[in-house]
Amino acid sequence: MARNLPATVLSDGTILLEVNNPEYESARDAIMRFADLVKSPEYIHTYRLSVLSLWNAASCGFTSEQVIEELSSYSRYPLPENIIVHIKDTMDKFGITKLTYEDGNLILICSDPFIMEEIRRSDRMEPHIERPAGKDSLIIKAYSRGLVKQILIKMGYPCEDLAGYTEGDPLDMSLASITREGLPFSLRPYQKDARDAFWAGGSVRGGSGVIVLPCGAGKTVVGMGVMELVGAQTLILTTNVVALRQWINELLDKSNLTEDMVKEYSGDKKEVGPVTVTTYQILAYRKRGTSKEIFPHFDLFNKRNWGLIIYDEVHLLPAPVFRITADLQARRRLGLTATLVREDGREDDVFSLIGPKKFDKPWKELEAQNWIAAAHCHEIRVDFPQDKRLEYHVAGERDKYRIAATNPEKYPLVKAIIERHPEDQILVLGQYIDQLEHIAALLDAPMIYGQTPNSTREELYEKFREGEIRVLVVSKVANFAVDLPDASVAIQVSGTFGSRQEEAQRLGRILRPKPQGESATFYTLVTRNTKDQEFSQKRQLFLTEQGYKYTIWESQDFLNQWKRRNQR
């Protein structure tokens, strides 16, 4: 007999979760730790037990028995027998292969003799094997540590790396108890938990992996806490120059590090010190006309004896940096991100080269504890003007989205929303520059996009923080690692197709906790029954998984409600 529980687990690994069930929220919080959200229409959300989601759960300490027990406790029907077997087989593969370091040799150990034979005979593994070390072990070439882990995860045997790390040159760093502005400072409880999960008491079981925390939850501070524990010279990789300088400001504000110890390596400066902060862009730069293999700034990885490398917004790590990271497996590596989702599907490379997920905290849990602002999400659907419909329907697939996303009917809505929030600091976010230029002119508001000089960006961000600017129009350059704590309203007029990570990052711009505990409001404007609406639903997946709900409005209903409110 069926029980009144929210989940139905199918034999193909699909989990159907009923939203209106009283136990939906607790089931969602449990399931999201070991399954991926696939789609989220109004009443039934669909999850899937993926191999990588189960391996990440295993790396966080979950056992197959715990996952089966959690699923069973929320499942309306008994779990299919093949799913029980799948969970056990998948999770039990984590740790079958291990890398260790013994007597000056890198050793690959495999606890299953048949899998070991498969590895021995693999054409991909053969170039990396020095010689056999025993029935269950191989000596691996020293430079192949990262490549071997990449190969093994593709073969279906994620490798637990216990080979240890180069300590790096020492760094005398400690976190401050009072900031430079005289404010008290300490790590929050969950920040300590994240730091300690990564460090694992300094053992070989720690020292590499990814910390997943919402935007606004202080991932930079977690990174600084790890730096203090490691106590070694550190290279920090960030998304852009603005983020780079925010890292430097935070380090100088909240630690004993001085300006001569923290250096910027960017297009403007090429300085290297005990702590050096750079960008993915500068590392992936190569001169036109040179070999695709030549990246002149890769030598930064050898300029110092780094004991720790921090990858900020690790979900954005570009392919060339993956390549150099494969050679850096003897260095401790910390990835920081709000979401492990990568639109290029290379989550397994993050797992094998940076490390598995070490800590994850649901967004709604931190919201309930007032560490991040509560947020209300709205999707407002607008119609096409008649003169745009033919252009849309005869366009190619890519142009269809651009035409729908830049629908001019969105402009009066943007203005109406801003009038609705007269006291708030507001970000207008979009993908298409001509659309943003029109909105900036309409609102008489400043705009930041890719061509805006870094000095101008920083000046405008600072004026926004100080309240001199109330509305700021920004392109995707502001998606990541921009600290605008007073921003409380975001209006998204267009996005990068169906990018789930972008939606999460854009909401994150307004999640910094507010002085009086005020909530944040996120609007996304979409053209009804078009690619714009279709991609919007894909973008919302990650946030839906985190517990956010979108109120759906018809544009005229939204405007009428606002008019009625003004007439009262």
Question: Which residue stretches match the model-derived regions?
Answer:
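Extended alpha-helical interface modules used as scaffolds for assembling large macromolecular complexes
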Residues: M1-L175
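Walker A/P-loop
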Residues: S203-V226
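Conserved helix-turn-beta segment of the N-terminal RecA-like "Helicase ATP-binding" lobe
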Residues: V242-D268
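Conserved helicase ATPase core of P-loop NTP-dependent helicases/translocases
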Residues: V262-E264, L427, D434-H438, D444-N479
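Post-DEXD/H (motif II) to motif III coupling segment of the RecA-like Helicase ATP-binding lobe
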Residues: L308, H315-H378, L543
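Conserved SF2 helicase motif VI
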Residues: L340, F497-S519
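Conserved interdomain hinge at the start of the Helicase C-terminal
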Residues: V394-Q431, E437-H438
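Conserved segment of the helicase C-terminal RecA-like domain
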Residues: R509-R539
